[in-house]
C-alpha cells in the first residue's frame, strides 16, 4: 500500500510542478530505465543551471554509468513550457528509476552529492558491478 501511496503522491506532485506539455517527453517511458534530474529555473541563463551543465559535461562517464538524464524547464519561453517553481528561482529534483522523488532542493548541489545518494541505493549497488568507466 505504501508504494501505491508514493505513486499517487508523485503523480500529484508532478501534476503541480511539471507542465502538462513536455514537448513530447513522457517520464513514464524512462521508468525502470533511467534516473532523471529535473531542473526548473526562471530562465536558461540561471547561474545554478549553468553550473550544473558544466559539471555534467565534466562527469559524462559517471552520468552514463548511473543512467542519468537531465530535463530542464524554464519560464522564459525558450523551452515553450510554463512551470510553477513555488516562487523559487531554481529547483532540482532527482527521480529514481522507480519513479520516486529521491532528492529535492531549491539550491544547486554538486553532482558528487547526487552520485553518492544514487550509489547508496540498492538498485545502483547491483549496477555498480557493471560500470562502464
Predicted regions and their residues:
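Non-catalytic interaction/Regulatory regions outside core domains
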Residues: 2-8, 13-133
Amino acid at each position: 500500500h505504501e508504494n501505491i501511496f508514493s505513486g499517487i503522491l508523485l503523480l500529484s506532485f508532478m501534476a503541480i510542478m511539471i507542465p502538462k506539455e513536455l514537448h513530447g517527453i513522457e517520464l513514464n517511458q524512462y521508468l525502470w530505465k533511467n534516473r532523471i534530474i529535473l531542473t526548473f529555473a526562471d530562465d536558461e541563463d540561471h547561474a545554478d543551471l549553468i553550473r550544473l551543465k558544466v559539471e555534467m559535461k565534466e562527469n559524462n562517464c559517471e552520468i552514463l554509468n548511473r543512467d542519468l538524464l537531465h530535463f530542464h524547464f524554464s519560464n522564459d519561453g525558450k523551452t515553450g513550457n510554463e512551470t510553477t517553481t513555488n516562487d523559487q528561482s531554481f529547483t532540482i529534483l532527482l527521480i529514481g528509476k522507480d519513479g520516486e522523488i529521491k532528492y529535492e532542493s531549491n539550491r544547486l548541489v554538486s553532482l558528487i552529492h547526487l552520485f553518492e545518494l544514487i550509489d547508496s541505493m540498492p538498485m545502483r549497488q547491483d549496477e555498480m558491478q557493471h560500470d562502464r568507466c
